[in-house]
């Protein structure tokens, strides 16, 4: 997968090699996350967080990561604060917002809505959760954590048994995690 300029809509986009590259990159970024190294690699770049459903961890983690790498973050956390409330289409909202952003992370209550938004965007869009459909970034984080925990015990993720507990029918993160575990 070519990452530069690409949307992240579904965990199905990633092959095993892609996931391994993401994890290698994540490992290289740990010193920046821990603040033992500083960088301004994203200086001048703007992330727009568009979260139309409640979020603490996803919204804050994307924003914090972008800030740590030197970028700026714009937050929209309520649909009522946008022209969508007045009937503007996702297409039009996407066209406008992508003119002011370098990348957009979006969470929306309707399955498929983030993909619709991304199709109209002029900048990359990351799915931060769309209804009960998918949450690819959470699945990648969960898999990364499982892998690191197993490795700390001298084991690998190959042939590991993973138990999933919680809302298995409507939990978008679980849906994405099940796909990537296969």
Predicted regions and their residues:
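Positively charged, low-complexity intrinsically disordered leader regions
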Residues: 1-60
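A generic local structural motif
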Residues: 33-37, 90-93, 175
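Glycine-rich phosphate/diphosphate-binding loop of Rossmann-like nucleotide-binding domains
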Residues: 52-64, 148-182
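Phosphate/diphosphate ligand-binding glycine-rich loop within oxidoreductases
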Residues: 41-147
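Active-site-adjacent beta-strand anchor residues
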Residues: 12, 107, 167
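Alpha-helical scaffold segments in soluble metabolic enzymes
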Residues: 21-28, 96, 116, 141-148, ...
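Glycine-rich nucleotide phosphate-binding loop and flanking beta-alpha elements
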Residues: 30, 111-112, 171
